[in-house]
């Protein structure tokens, strides 16, 4: 929904436009832009990219929506990436957080392969910031990391920091008390 935040407007505080997703059960989570300061660097190859598209992951469905918000009062779905494409090109599921970066759009996931997302570890994949095609996985070697959550990087030092949360069975239907007490949720950061 688009809410009017212009204080002098007659529709201030009201919903002035909506975009309805064509499917149910996606559970939208941690949206992000196609362009930001990390992607607009002259060294990135797309220094003049327009901050126009909102990337919205469906954490339960593994579907990703690309919303064109150039005109917020006419926002619309530009593209939908279906779960099968995410699985096929990355081996990951449950996309969680979107960050734009120097090589494209980075997407952290909470699930790996398999129906419940636990047959392989989750991770990060990259999408092209102009075509929104999935390029592939980011990690060359994830080391011992078997859970994932959010991430950010120190570009001048050329390293990424990522955190852990839990695997899909540990959050999709609420916290699992035994896992919480047993220390089975994520509690590390990785560099």
Q: Could you describe each region identified by the protein language model?
A:
Residues 1, 42-52, 56-57, 108-120, ...:
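Short, conserved, GDST-rich strand-edge loop motifs in beta-rich repeat architectures
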Residues 2-3, 120-132, 180-191:
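Beta-propeller blade signature
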Residues 1-37, 47-49, 56-82, 119, 141-191, ...:
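Beta-propeller domains
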Residues 16, 22-25, 90-92, 143-146, ...:
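Short loop/turn positions that demarcate and connect the beta-strands within blades
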Residues 27-50, 91-102, 151-158, 167:
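Structural signature of eukaryotic scaffold interfaces centered on beta-propeller domains
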Residues 69-155:
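Asp-box/WD-like beta-propeller blade repeats and closely related beta-sheet repeat scaffolds
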